Amino acid sequence: VGFVIPVSVLLNFIFSGFSIIDFKEIFYTSFFSITLAFTGAFFVMLVSIFLILISNYKSNNLQKSIIFLASCGYALPGTILAVGMVIFLGWINEYLHFHLSYFAGGFIVLIFAYIVRFLAVGNASIRSGILKIHPNAMDASLTMGAGFFRGVKIVIMPLLLSNILIGGILVFVDILKELPITLLLRPFNF
């Protein structure tokens, strides 16, 4: 009954000629949703790569603890995080006398909220890839004269490529599903 009645009503709308479908509007909103999710996933994975590489190769226990705390945003509800972002922006605007009205309903705040929310997903993907790499791989590149960044580029990044792509897909899908943050922080006329 819970399936048959809604499907029969929808089929009745289709066959009776009642159409609420506006393909131009659907394409427009789908394009912006996919663009926003792709941009958010890109920045989440970029920050995740940076944090995990630093925590694995160049950090002490305090830095590792801070990076662990950065991953706790996934436990917060999206609505609480969005309201917290608005309060944080208001605090910055009031006390530091920045004019952040351009950012208050913009993509920058939305992307930052996505980074805070989904950093745990990106970190988990990158960390699982880092754990598969032998610890001496980076040391070998440093011994052969490559600097840290060149060693990361030549040795680590090719080995992490599949984890980066999988983590990016997971974050992309999570951002597409995240309605509270998007609805509360979206730009006007979006």
Label each region the model flagged:
Residues 5-12, 46-51, 80, 109-112, ...:
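Membrane-embedded alpha-helices of multi-pass transport/permease systems
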Residues 7-43, 58-63:
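Periplasmic/extracellular loop-to-transmembrane helix junction in inner-membrane transport proteins
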Residues 30, 55, 72, 128, ...:
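Short hydrophobic faces within alpha-helices
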Residues 40-70, 137, 151-155:
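Transmembrane-helix boundary motif in ABC transporter permease subunits
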Residues 116, 123-126, 134, 148-177:
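Transmembrane alpha-helices
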